[in-house]
Amino acid sequence: MEAIKNKMQAMKLEKDNAIDRAEIAEQKSRDANLRAEKSEEEVRGLQKKIQQIENELDQVQESLTQANTKLEEKEKSLQTAEGDVAALNRRIQLIEEDLERSEGRLKIATSKLEEASQSADESERMRKMLEHRSITDEERMEGLESQLKEARMMAEDADRKYDEVARKLAMVEADLERAEERAETGESKIVELEEELRVVGNNLKSLEVSEEKAQQREEAYEQQIRIMTTKLKEAEARAEFAERSVQKLQKEVDRLEDELVHEKEKYKSISDELDQTFAELTGY
């Protein structure tokens, strides 16, 4: 009987212990459920935050793509502008070379005109001296004929010089198509000068040219000098225009360089913002 009681007490004690363990297990189960629910809530929060970060990352990447596209467009525009600048520089160089050749022609023509004027003046002075001498004196007539021969030689030498200049001008004409009309005008004037020199030779030969005709030739020379002076002024005006074009082109180059610097700074700012955003995302 005593053994049964002891066994009953042991069973009761075991029952109580089992109940306690069951309550503890239930409490642990409730605690585990609470922790699981809290963990699930945290997971949902993290997933939501990750989704939000991914959306922001997509927006940032899209902005970066747009910025890169704009930058590429700006670089293409800049390359096009640089090509235009190079073309303008080549064009200005050609204009300057054309102007230099024109100025060379003008100097040659001016020098030729001066030589013609000097020869004509010398011939005119000789003609006046011959007119005032008495042609009845045989010895003086021989002297006049000798001077006339010298004048003819001077005129022929001038003709040879003018022929040489004309050949040089003809060679230059092949490289100066834009100034062809001016060259033709210059050659026409050279022919006129040669014709006037031949007239001077005839005057020296015949001694019958009057003072009025000499005055007309002098006026013609002065008119040709005025024409040459006008051409020189035109050449100087073209040089000034070319210089203004170069200055304008330099301003355009400076503006494009400033725009390029601005775009580079803008691109650097965007890159810095992206780096900062990536750093913040990495920190999460």
Swiss-Prot record:
Disordered: annotated span: 22-43
Assembly, per entry: Homodimer.
Domain of life from the UniProt record: Eukaryota
InterPro entries xrefs: Tropomyosin (IPR000533)
PROSITE patterns: TROPOMYOSIN
Protein name as it appears in the record: Tropomyosin
Domain observations: The molecule is in a coiled coil structure that is formed by 2 polypeptide chains. The sequence exhibits a prominent seven-residues periodicity.
Coiled coil: 1-284
Function, as annotated: Tropomyosin, in association with the troponin complex, plays a central role in the calcium dependent regulation of muscle contraction.
Family in the record: Belongs to the tropomyosin family.
Biological source species: Lepidoglyphus destructor
Keywords from the UniProt entry: Allergen, Coiled coil, Repeat
